[in-house]
Each structure stands twice: as C-alpha cells, then as structure tokens.
C-alpha cells in the first residue's frame, strides 16, 4: 500500500462519548509548552490540515474527538494530550481525560498497578490527576481531579430572536462554557429533543461569542465560549446536562469540563461546599459523579477544584492512512449528517 501518512488510534468511549486516542504515528507538534502546541494547531495551516485529516470525512465522523498523545513537558506528568474536534483543537475535556487514561493503562503505555493507578495528564489547561481503579488488567473507572474552575460572570443577559431575553452563566471548567437553564428555551433534556437542543446551542454560542469576549487570565491561548451546556435539576438533586458541540451535535457523556464549570456556579451561589458530591446525567442517561474537592483562586478570582468520576471502554483499534492520490486529504463535511453549520468547516 502506498500510504504517505499513518496514525494508529485506540477507540475508546467514556459514558457514551467517543474519544479516540492516537497512540502511534502522531507527527511532531511545534511548541515549547502544551499551550503553545495548542495555539499552533489552531493557527498554523499544517495544524489545521492534521485536524481535518483525522476529524472530517472520510476518515472521521461528526461524533467524538481525537486525542493526540504528546510527550509530557511537565516533570510531574506521565503523558500529555490535546483534543482535536471538527471545529478546532481544545485544551481540556473530562470525558477525553477518562478515554486517554483508559487507553494509556489498557494498552500498556503506562504500567497498570492494581487495585489503583495514578496517572498525571498534562493538558494546555494544566495538570489533571487521574486515579484509576483497576482489576484483572482492566481500568474499571477513573476519578479526575480537574483544573481550577471559576465563574467569569453570572446571569449574563442575551437577546435572542427565538426566546427573548435569556440568562447564561459564563464559566471556566478547563474551557469556557455558557451554562443555560434548559427551561428558558422551552425544551427538556431527553433523546427526542437532541436536534432542537443542538440547534439552540449553536444559535446561542454564535450570539455570545459575537458580543462577549472571554479569555483565561493566565492562559491566553484559551479564549472564547467553546460550548453551550444546557442544564436542569431533577427532584433528587441529579443534574441533567446536554453540552452542544459545533457544527451540530450533542455530547453523549454528562461532560466533565461542563460540570466543572457548573460546580463553580453552584459554589458561587452558595449551593455547593467542599465535600459535596452529586450525580450528573447525560442526554442518553449515562452518569458522572461530580465532587467539590477544594477551593482556591485563579488570578485573584474564587475557584473550585472539581472531581469527575466515570468509566471508559475500549472498543476498537484503527489505523488511519492517506493514499498519496486521495483527492480529499483535508476531508470534508456535509450538512446531511454534520448539521447546518457544516458549510463553515
């Protein structure tokens, strides 16, 4: 076979959300830090080419992410990674951290210790401590100690053409979120409403990023609202979530970074304290356990240290390749399955 590029992927999902892990063939990514490498992936044409190669058709699909395993730069880290999605490279993700931890341990890249293995992951947002419960050569569950999460602004009013004025909390949980109580758009979080939730999320994200600028005070490479997450609280205190992702799909997992951001809002409103633990449920009914481990500060702002616990499952091993005569090395996306914003890719 006349392939000019090959990348090996271990297929993993965390509570339903696919996070393929590139375990071989990853090209060298320029940059002295993981944040600098993230910036390169999002600004250099060669970085864009790599993302499109892996994430778009015919090699990719509108669901899931591809995680690039990279050499760690921090002396305390076991591995580093950056998340690639159809829109751009992202700094941090709870479900993808679970996928990466599961892949590292079950592939033997990091030696598994039973009954517990601690893996320190380096991301552009900082270090994530992953505590994996292991038995009989399998990673049964992963508890993540997430990066400090904080509120940018609560109850931001947004003028919308469909729902009038709605309020959103703009918060950081590893990336920036707009958190919206789902009742404001007259929907509930359930499978049958996935398309409507996604459409609303895409509209709101565009409106927010058009009018409001958010930048991490210590990591300028992380800026802009990445996702809109709809939320609701069930009678037993379970937080129901649906994170909407460009160009038009719903996160299948409860969303680790989104729940981290939401935990910051709960703490800011006096609804969560250190030691509290609650359940978050996704649109497909899968669950994360969310805890408030500690409080801290980020650039003088109150912040929380969340924990996210969930499960990862391997389901395949793939080798992605490029034939030198392939007319679509940069991939493509169509609105039939990629959503109404696919034409912007």
Swiss-Prot record:
It comes from the Bacteria. SUPFAM superfamilies: Diaminopimelate epimerase-like (SSF54506). It is an enzyme of class 5 (isomerase). Signal peptide: none annotated. InterPro entries: Pro_racemase_fam. Pfam families: Pro_racemase (PF05544). Substrate binds at residues 85, 94-95, 251, 256-257. Belongs to the proline racemase family. One of its GO terms (molecular function) is 4-hydroxyproline epimerase activity. The active site is at 93 (proton acceptor), 255 (proton donor). Catalyzes the epimerization of trans-4-hydroxy-L-proline (t4LHyp) to cis-4-hydroxy-D-proline (c4DHyp). May be involved in a degradation pathway of t4LHyp. Can also catalyze the epimerization of trans-3-hydroxy-L-proline (t3LHyp) to cis-3-hydroxy-D-proline (c3DHyp) in vitro, albeit with 2-fold lower efficiency. Displays no proline racemase activity. Keywords: Isomerase. This is 4-hydroxyproline 2-epimerase. The lineage of its organism: Bacteria, Pseudomonadati, Pseudomonadota, Alphaproteobacteria, Hyphomicrobiales. Transmembrane segments: none annotated. Its EC number is 5.1.1.8. PANTHER family: BIFUNCTIONAL TRANS-3-HYDROXY-L-PROLINE DEHYDRATASE_2-EPIMERASE (PTHR33442:SF5), TRANS-3-HYDROXY-L-PROLINE DEHYDRATASE (PTHR33442). It catalyses: trans-4-hydroxy-L-proline = cis-4-hydroxy-D-proline. It comes from Rhizobium etli (strain ATCC 51251 / DSM 11541 / JCM 21823 / NBRC 15573 / CFN 42).
